[in-house]
Amino acid sequence: MMRPADKVGVALLSDEEIPTCFQVLSKSFGHDAPFVDMYFPDHDTSSGQAQGSKRLTVWKQTAKNSTFLKAVTQAGQGDQEHIIGVAIWTYMKEPPPAELDKVENVEEVWPDEDDLEFMTRLWRDYVIPRTQAIKDSYGKGIYVLELLAVHPGYQRLGAGTALVKWGTKAADERGLKAVVEGTPVARRLYEQCGLRAEIEEMRFDVGEEFIGRRKPKLIYMTREPKF
């Protein structure tokens, strides 16, 4: 745990640090976020973490408009740095593909046909609000917080706030709207950083055959740029 003298900072994430950050992601969400559970299958197992880390590494290496950040704590000179949080901010000028198989190796990640179909339908609805925001930007684009996770042992210490404000500052500098599909648990944090709910509960039409599965509870939140 942190000591009173510890400070939280934000820095760019290296490829080598992605496995550590994926463990933070898994511990942060546990099994309380259905979208995370489906998007990163078995994320709390060694095989799931290996696969998730591999996917994040490919994302980081191929998406030039995505910035991977870490929140770190370091008590003083010579003390070991601890990664306690992770965030991914993306400058998005083109609408994301509505078809999951255009952004993921779907057969490898979701070998079960029902899981794949369920995730495909979730994804199709998930990208609708940000797609509309991009269309409404008249070519400027938006700044999207695609992932935010803070280790449960280091929450309420400012890591989440620092990671969010890094992106809202970058959005302001570009004159762009910032958006996030946030969980209800994180709502207060986002509101403290200036984001406001535009859609109180995002809609996921997954069909009658998946009525027994947990659907995500996500709030679509936005923040206008401050000049």
Named regions from a protein language model:
Residues R130-Y138, A162-K177:
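Conserved acyl-CoA
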Residues H43-K70, Q74, E94, D115-F118, ...:
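A short helix-loop-beta-strand connector motif used in the catalytic cores of GNAT acetyltransferases and
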Residues G9-Q23:
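A short beta-loop-alpha structural element at the N-terminal edge
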Residues V150, R156-K169, Q192:
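Conserved acetyl-CoA-binding loop-helix of GNAT-fold acetyltransferases
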Residues L145, A178-G182:
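Conserved hydrophobic beta-strand within the GNAT/NAT acetyltransferase core sheet
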Residues D79-A149, Q155, M202-P216, F227:
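Conserved acyl-donor/pantetheine-binding loop and adjacent beta-alpha core of acyl/acetyltransferases
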Residues T161, E173-G175, P184-F204:
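Conserved active-site alpha-helix within GNAT-family acetyltransferase domains
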Residues S66-F68, I84, K215-M221:
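Short hydrophobic/aromatic beta-strand or adjacent loop that forms the aromatic wall/cage
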